[in-house]
Curated annotation (Swiss-Prot):
Presence of keyword Isomerase: no
Enzyme Commission number(s): 6.1.1.4
UniProt xrefs under HAMAP family: Leu_tRNA_synth_B
Protein name, entry field: Leucine--tRNA ligase
Binding residues for ATP: 639
Record's keyword terms, sorted: Aminoacyl-tRNA synthetase, ATP-binding, Cytoplasm, Ligase, Nucleotide-binding, Protein biosynthesis
GO molecular function, one term: leucine-tRNA ligase activity
A GO cellular-component term linked to this record: cytosol
Amino acid sequence: MSTERYNAREVEPRWQQIWDEKGVFASRNDDSRPKYYVLEMFPYPSGRIHMGHVRNYTMGDVVARYRRAKGHNVLHPMGWDAFGMPAENAAMQNKTHPAKWTYANIAAMKKQLKSMGLSLDWAREIATCDPSYYKHQQRMFLDFLKAGLVERKQSKVNWDPVDQTVLANEQVIDGRGWRSGALVEQRELTQWFFKISDYSEELLTALDTLDRWPEKVRLMQKNWIGRSEGLLVRFALDAATAPAGESEVEVFTTRPDTLFGAKFVALSPDHPLAAEVAKANPKLEAFIAECHRHGTAQAEIDTAEKLGFDTGLRARHPFDPDWLLPVYVANFVLMDYGTGAIFGCPAHDQRDLDFVNKYGLGNTPVVCPEGQDPKSFVITDTAYDGDGRMINSRFLDGMTIADAKEDVAKRLETATLPRANGGGNAPVAKRQVNYRLRDWGISRQRYWGCPIPIIHCESCGIVPVPVKDLPVKLPDDIEFDRPGNPLDRHPTWKHVACPQCGGKARRETDTMDTFVDSSWYFARFTDPWNENAPTTRKVVDAMMPVDQYIGGIEHAILHLLYSRFFTRAMKATGHVGFDEPFAGLFTQGMVVHETYKNADGSWAAPSEIKIEGTGDARHATLIDTGAPVEIGSIEKMSKSKRNTIDPDDIIGTYGADTARWFMLSDSPPDRDVIWSEEGVQGANRFVQRVWRLVNLAAPHLPKDSAAAGTSADTKPLRSTAHRTLADVSQAIERLRFNTAIAKLYAFVGPLNEAIDDPRLKADPAWAASVREALDMLVRMIAPMMPHLAEQCWEALGGQGLVSEAAWPEVDPVLLVEDTITLPVQINGKKRADVTVGRNAPNPEIEAAVLALDAVKTALAGATPRKIIVVPQRIVNVVV
């Protein structure tokens, strides 16, 4: 048997080829075994995988291999989230077609992923940019449209005047386009929307059923949906100041208890009343236009200076018609939340306080903290938003906030005002539930996306593309010679005959948001060969939901929430029979690395520097010049700070198994892992150690472990092996991979001693117990280090592939300890512990207790009055 070092560069490609040739990881839709669907969020084909990919996909692979060994029919597919702006940028910069760029990147990344030894079913591979995929996405768009889940409407968007395209809120940085740097404008555009808001309450309440999701993610979605209960209050406008035909403004508030602290009413710049007043007020018109020159992102609005324009209108307080409140147009009020109008209570809302301090409107506290003197309680620069009792609020004084809210609601529900459009009176207020969640605008002015299957006809209006004509394919002869949407400029593609009247018409030139592509790919994986429908109902309902979904927490809201909505929309249109796509969700931590900075402030890559010394004496220099380099903070790996490690370099030097092992071993999987060369080298030493143990033992081992027995000689090793197996199994099932690896590290120590023991060559029972322990070790490391495990399995003469071997069974008998430690009390107080045989008779236990130093000291040579032994619980010595 060879004892040469394990050579990953030779071993790993060999086993990868064998797995491919045998189709080991193919999943069958007609398999009778219980299914287990494990999925990692599929990647964007940027051209290179990074260490975050290595960590993410290794975790999923461990779960897949473990579940396969446990007897499940495992579905573990891979695909490509392939549409998106980077491909268009590459086309503009490199004069390359987005499709060519994308598919070249897919080929490169697929090769890299295969080098990791992932147990993927590549037969199910999909790319969202392929017409065979987006054909079905277009079909579902039409189904959603027919079901009333899609609508076309005007919407405020962030418009980049240089790139001539809509920007997502996340693409607006300090008021400028992320790519062009141009000042972003607000524009009113006609957009296509998915009506996710119809599912607000359902999406919210169903979060309680997702008990295998991180609580943090559920809370983030809950806050994003933003359910709020409040009052819709009608403020009558002072007739002397109001435009003709305007008599009131409606305000939604979650704090009706603070009405007596009101100092102003504020309208959104997009409120119809603001527009009406602006017709006769050029200065207000200019102010509204200035508001529109800023982005629509909530974060930008929250951090911007609070600006307002006094319209001259005055609103009457709901409880006091003589109390007139100034009506402003304010840049921080959003039209798409509530009614687009608020009343401001500055003492108890920081945004309102900043506003009144700027415009000198003052504030009146109406909630006083418990224990504070109401007479001396004042607000200056910091609003009070805590609990307390009502003050300065007339009939509400002394009430709790909750009681005050209810009292206000009851009073205003019974009070009335004339209806704005005539026809008698109506209540001043009514209870209402609002949601922060807005409909999902999916229109993008991009080429490289899924075409929206709609035709615009002057005679017939909006006409769906007939299903028989799907897919609507993107044209190949496209030019990226200037900004904007190339589909708008295409000479022929957008011109088409109307399917209804045959007249001249044009195609919809917007494409779908790429989040649509990733909102159903998990369902397509269940039967990607179905050419006639997005899903095969029998198959998708059997294989879904995904049992374990793995990805970054940065997708907690958009992707995961959109997927939950999309699944419900698919159910409503008959494509699936379930509501939730992901039964279990795990969000892994990032891969981080030190940063290094040159004297000129530029970043240095880890491959360019040499680090010497330890602790405070640790320092870095450039390899080429010897110039000193500043060792900076540990941060997420990023190209901009050049603190990245190329997975190809690590796999080429140490092998995929070393990279996988290190990624799993160094920290809990939900926390960041700090990349270190020392840690990788330590992982590689363990690879070599396992290989050495197998090679040393293999020539002396029997074919099986039948002769191991449970003698006093062999039981300790066997018990250690079975205890390790139980612990590793539990850790993997809980996704505590670092804990599993720690148990395996600990197990190798006694296993090494057992192999070095002379009895290996002389005692058949001993050799059989070593055989069992090694077999178990190899099968336990197989999910983490599959190539090494296959090589060791072969060296041990194992049957078939370890990738197809069953997970070992724990013998519960071997988990029972032979000894037990009992507390020893003297006159009811614990003084010592005694370790005895688990089934030792009382006289033996009593003798062991009397031999303890603590008992001897207490007795001082005397005989105890009695010794009480509670079997396997406690011993009490009565002196």
